[in-house]
Amino acid sequence: MTVDRRSVLRGLAAAALGGTVGCGRDPLARGRQSVSLWFSYGGKNREVLERMVARYNASQQAVYVQATFQGDYFEALAKLRTAIVAGAAPAMSHVVGEVVPYLHEAGVLEPLDGYPGAADLGLVRALAQEGTYTPTEPKPLVALPFNRSTPILYWNGSMLEKARLTVPDTWDALRDAAKALTNRSGDRVSTWGLECPISWWFWVALVGQAGGEVMRQDGYPLLGEEAGVEALQLWQRMVHEDRTMRPPPGRDYNAWQVTNQDFLAGRAAMIYTSTAFLRYLEDNATFPVRAAPLPGFRRRAVPTGGTFFVLMRGAPEGEKRAAWDFLRWMMLPDQTIEWATSTGYMPVATEAVTRLEQDGFYKKSPNDRVAMDQLQHAMPWPWAASLFRVQRECVDPRLEEAVLNRRDARELLAEARKQALEDT
């Protein structure tokens, strides 16, 4: 029997829907243009998104959005790529910023410039496509921001006050604070001074603070050059020499979850993680949660993170029009305010930021202001199709090896650069 590859892939893509295929449809969907959205928000953020989708569906009679959870960002992206090959992709999804150039160059993203109102969305430039990437020749609009973030420093307010410390704003001050906050009895540590996932995003922040860049505008993998080495060496020193930093176990977002849980349990006095977890940490902590910009070294620098909404070029025209109506609704100030104030992500509409300032939101919730203030130090990503592959295949696997096994940082980054160039 001949097995058709596309039939197999369509089956895999259908399985990726996670049980929604064949389920009874919401009566609200009858007589409307139905359109699918694959998403990756978990926990409280998932609840917020599903609430907003339900509100959109109830607000009009023409479009019905079927939102389906697909796992974390990387799990969802793997499913999306399988579905694209199979011709069974959803009309819309959201993807990490590092993969947008690759998907665009592959020709699978719908250009959005010609859709009604695309030129008048009023987005925060640093969070929108035009400000997220290094300037190159003009690119079509293919991605709309929504859950956008930066890494920030969180600390246990009670512990910092008890230790009579000020918030660290340099690498040296961070090391000193971590030493003062680490609680050790022999080889047993009850509280670590700092916990940070050993992953790409946080390493990129350190590279920028040391004055480096991960890539040139033409896509050449600099990997920070000497700054990349210094970034890894900071982690190595704090883990092995100072013994004040815990690298959390687990890969990808599992390590992020461990970091959050250790912080809430008092096992970490300070953590590096995303502003996306702000509301979750505040709601679940038994101590005052405080946030601050990441400490600098030669300069202040942070990468932006989170994801962009994208439309699939191969979707039926009716579904694309329906998806655009939903995405345009999600870009409106009311929706971006609801999303930001309910989660900790940054509002992507300039009018939303203005309204939050005028209403005194940031005075009442200063932690929410931290990521917005950091945008003045945001590092643009290169518009390079190889960026995501360099992240996932060349750099990420080596970071943990460098820190946990204390391999030579310069040697490992040279290996990563060599692999990146060979695969180009």
List each language-model region with its residue ranges.
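N-terminal export signals
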Residues: 7-25
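Extracytoplasmic "Venus flytrap"/periplasmic binding protein-like
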Residues: 55, 59-126, 158-169, 261-262, ...
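Glycine-centered hinge/linker elements that transmit conformational signals in sensory
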Residues: 178-180, 220-252
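Conserved C-terminal helix/tail region of periplasmic/extracytoplasmic solute-binding proteins
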Residues: 161, 373-424
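Extracytoplasmic/periplasmic substrate-recognition and gating elements
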Residues: 58-59, 66, 139, 162-163, ...
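Extracytoplasmic/periplasmic solute-binding protein
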Residues: 134-146, 151, 175-222, 227, ...
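Hinge/lid segment of periplasmic solute-binding proteins
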Residues: 97-152, 175, 290, 360-365, ...
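Long, aromatic- and glycine/proline-rich binding clefts that accommodate carbohydrate-like moieties
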Residues: 124-134, 289-292, 341-393, 401
